[in-house]
Amino acid sequence: MSVAITASAGMQRWVDDAAEFPRAVPARLRMLLDTGLVHEAGGTYLERPSAELLERMPAAELEAFVNRVSLDTLKPVQRLERGSEPWCYEAVAIGIAFGERVLAASAGHVSIVLDLDEERSSCVLRFTSGPWAPPHPDEVDWLGMVRG
């Protein structure tokens, strides 16, 4: 089981900062970092789901994430100005949480892409799922370029 989280150039630094500076991020994401978030091959991978988090993730939130959903459609998430730290960290946290729920249900692999919607000034998460497979070499190369 694994979750691969990749990010656009505009979002990658929030993913990196969340893993590198856990004390600077909200408690919800800090809990995720403490339960198995690691860096591998240019992506961020969660190797095991957190039972506590699975129980706390409402079904309505899961239903909201169909293909492409922006964070401002979720009632529990306070929408902040684009580029503010809590807002972007929350996007990462919700992406990880959603991936955990899919893993628990399917025992497969989930890819989560975080991006910025310039027109709506909101974070966007796109999800795909399927059987586990290592990241494609082209994807890793692309991540290396945007993170450099």
Residue spans of the language-model regions?
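N-terminal leader/targeting segments
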Residues: 1-74
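Generic serine detector
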Residues: 2, 8, 50, 70, ...
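Long, charged/polar, surface-exposed segments that mediate recognition or autoinhibition
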Residues: 67-99
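Acidic, proline/glycine-rich low-complexity IDRs
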Residues: 90-148
